[in-house]
Amino acid sequence: MDLQSFSRGNPFSGLACVWCREPLTEVDAFRCMIKDFHVVYRDGVKFGACTTCLENCLDKERRLWKGVPVTGEEAQLLHGKSLDRLCIRCCYCGGKLTKNEKQRHVLYNEPFCKTRSNIIRGRCYDCCRHGSRSNYP
């Protein structure tokens, strides 16, 4: 199955990046969809996010807001929701962590990170499997 078959139902197809204003590639539009991003409106115009700008933005967030390590239990207490119901995104790629990825944090005692406005971040499987992206913070 190719990306074009996905683009028909993809709300990000044909949009530009909210930061650089360049048109999203089919791959970037697909990534926005599978990472469950929301279409962003600016002055009535729809935008998505290209991978380069998104990762640059997340890198800037990690540098500007030094995170505080929190356990899964602390994250649940902070937001009053179970870990399964919390929306936790990867601090490197921005993807939503699955239930299994959240449980990996708990099982391996890898802390989540509380950053600006009590946003909880973690690491997805793709960003931690080779060890190239370290624990955050």
Curated annotation (Swiss-Prot):
Gene Ontology biological process terms from the UniProt entry: DNA-templated transcription; regulation of DNA-templated transcription; symbiont-mediated perturbation of host apoptosis; symbiont-mediated perturbation of host ubiquitin-like protein modification; symbiont-mediated suppression of host innate immune response; symbiont-mediated suppression of host type I interferon-mediated signaling pathway
Family statement drawn from the similarity comment of this UniProt entry: Belongs to the papillomaviridae E6 protein family.
Keywords of this entry: Activator, DNA-binding, Early protein, Host cytoplasm, Host nucleus, Host-virus interaction, Inhibition of host innate immune response by virus, Metal-binding, Modulation of host cell apoptosis by virus, Transcription, Transcription regulation, Viral immunoevasion, Zinc, Zinc-finger
Compartments, record wording: Host cytoplasm; Host nucleus
Name assigned to this protein: Protein E6
Gene3D superfamilies: E6 early regulatory protein (3.30.240.40)
Positions of unnamed zinc fingers: 17-53, 90-127
InterPro entries registered for this protein in UniProt: E6, E6_sf
Coiled coil: none
Record's GO cellular component terms: host cell cytoplasm; host cell nucleus
HAMAP family linked: HPV_E6
UniProt function note: Plays a major role in the induction and maintenance of cellular transformation. E6 associates with host UBE3A/E6-AP ubiquitin-protein ligase and modulates its activity. Protects host keratinocytes from apoptosis by mediating the degradation of host BAK1. May also inhibit host immune response.
